Curated annotation (Swiss-Prot):
GO biological process: 'de novo' cotranslational protein folding; cell division; chaperone-mediated protein folding; protein transport; protein unfolding
Domain PPIase FKBP-type: 171-256
Function, in words: Involved in protein export. Acts as a chaperone by maintaining the newly synthesized protein in an open conformation. Functions as a peptidyl-prolyl cis-trans isomerase.
Gene3D superfamilies according to UniProt: 3.10.50.40, Trigger factor ribosome-binding domain, Trigger factor, C-terminal domain
Name by which UniProt lists this protein: Trigger factor
Pfam families according to UniProt: FKBP_C, Trigger_C, Trigger_N
Similarity remark: Belongs to the FKBP-type PPIase family. Tig subfamily.
């Protein structure tokens, strides 16, 4: 076998390979001999089918399989011998002439082909003991618990009809029907009947609910307002509209006492138990946000300390996925790049940078895991699948079966488990200091970071 490197440019390498026809033929013949003991043909006893007969029947297909396997094995051997870590599947170019291909299949010509390989660069990992990271810390206060319970109470609040002739007040629930027009013309999704709205809840577009204060049952008003400039329906964003609105029922909120009886309505024994449950839920919510903030800071540090050229094919693949998501969301929301104060060209540059960052961080995390023996066990993956299955009661077996039959789906389960294990490994080595912040600051930062790569 002859292997000649014809290109070594950055992360791209190309080779010209030639494998003697005799070697390929010998491998194919060995397969036919092995096939002799497995195949069953009428007129022949098991294991007694002549190889020459098998060659007439299966010779071409066996030769094709042999060539495919030889090319795959040769490519992997080339990478192994040179210490290459492949960034993707090698790209093989076979002879273009039909006669050349037929001669190779007939064993008359050597197997000659070229292959292009893109490799992952060697990564020099930073000393994680030098990392200094800040973790925001927020304690769950009694006020947080009380506020959360009040929200629960508001969600479970009952309403009763006001007396005849009563006017709607802020906090009342009003049943309305409306027809919306823009420039005197009805518009799609601008009309609805029997809509329940609590005045002051800001459930409707700005300015709508305020104009319903003082309305009575059976009364009709024309509500004049404007759609926000960032409204999700681009066709309506920023436009003035009028809604002919009729109220059919005015209901006043009933007082609700937060006590042991209220807790029992929720299936708990007493108010203290409700407070404990809510505190635990808030603690878990805060912990997730704090963890995400710390993880983001760590990924930023890894990004800053590991600058290298990522394999272009991986960056392109990641960019295509990101771009597809972005453009699909824009089409769904009927947005344009101009609406986002940018151009398509500028957006492509921005999202390609995001794709490059993601690929580099993925390679860094993978390298850290490989060099430090970090693995995700089958048991950990199974527990994660079970957790996902339990989120859709009644379909647990179906979801379990789906993951067991789809290696790609299982890989998507494994990826975040592996990433979090590597993150934990680095955090054990880094210096992490805690900083007290307000709940508002924690979730403000958390929301901002959730929109970034």
């Amino acid at each position: 076998m002859q292997v000649n490197e014809t290109l070594a440019e950055g992360l791209r390498h190309e080779f010209q390979i030639s494998i003697p026809a005799a070697e390929i033929t010998a491998k194919a013949d060995a397969r036919l001999v092995d096939l002799k003991d497995k195949v069953k043909l009428d007129g022949f006893r098991p294991g007694k089918v002549p190889v020459s007969h098998l060659k007439k029947m299966y010779g071409r297909s066996v030769m094709i399989e042999t060539i495919e396997d030889t090319i795959r094995d040769t490519n992997m051997q080339i990478a192994t011998d040179r210490g290459f870590k492949l960034a993707g599947n090698p790209k093989v170019t076979m002879p273009s002439e039909v006669k050349e291909i037929e001669d190779i299949l007939a064993g008359k010509s050597d197997l000659s082909y070229s292959v292009a390989i893109e490799v992952v660069p060697a990564i020099e990992l930073a000393d994680f003991k030098t990392f200094s990271l800040e973790k925001p810390v927020v304690d769950v206060s009694d006020a947080d618990v009380d506020e959360a319970i009040k929200r629960i109470a508001d969600q479970n609040r009952s309403y009763s009809a006001r007396a005849e002739g009563a006017k709607a007040e802020n906090g009342d629930r009003v049943t309305i029907s409306f027809k919306g027009t823009i420039d005197g013309e009805l518009f799609e999704a601008g009309s609805s009947d029997d809509v329940l709205v609590v005045l002051g809840s800001n459930a409707l577009i700005p300015g709508f609910e305020e104009q319903l204060v003082g309305i009575g049952a059976g009364e009709t008003r024309v509500v004049k307002t404007s759609f926000p400039s960032n409204y999700m329906e681009n066709d309506l964003a920023g436009k003035d509209a009028e809604f002919e609105t009729k109220a059919s029922l005015i209901e006043a909120p009933q007082d609700i006492k937060i006590d042991d009886e209220f807790a029992k309505l929720l299936g708990l024994e007493e108010l203290d138990q409700l407070k404990q449950v809510v505190r635990e839920q808030l603690s878990a919510e805060f912990a997730r946000a704090m963890r995400q903030h710390l993880k983001r800071a760590l990924l930023d540090r890894l990004d800053d300390t590991h600058k290298f050229d990522a394999p272009p094919s991986l960056v392109e693949e990641e960019f295509e996925q990101v771009w597809k998501t972005v453009t699909t969301e824009m089409e769904t929301n009927k947005k344009t790049f101009a609406d986002e104060n940018t151009t398509e060209e500028a957006a492509r540059v921005e999202y390609r940078q995001i794709a490059d960052r993601r690929v580099r961080l993925s390679l860094v995390l993978s390298d850290i895991g490989e060099k430090n023996g970090i693995k995700v066990t089958d048991d950990e993956i199974n527990r994660a699948v079970i957790s996902r299955a339990r989120q859709t009661p009644g379909r647990e077996k179906e979801i379990w079966s789906y993951y067991q039959k789809n290696p790609q789906a299982l890989a998507q389960v494994r990826a975040p488990l592996f990433e979090n294990k590597v993150v934990d490994f680095i955090l054990e080595l880094a210096t992490v200091t805690e900083k007290k912040v307000t709940r508002e600051d924690l979730f403000k930062d958390h929301e901002a970071h959730s929109t970034e790569a």
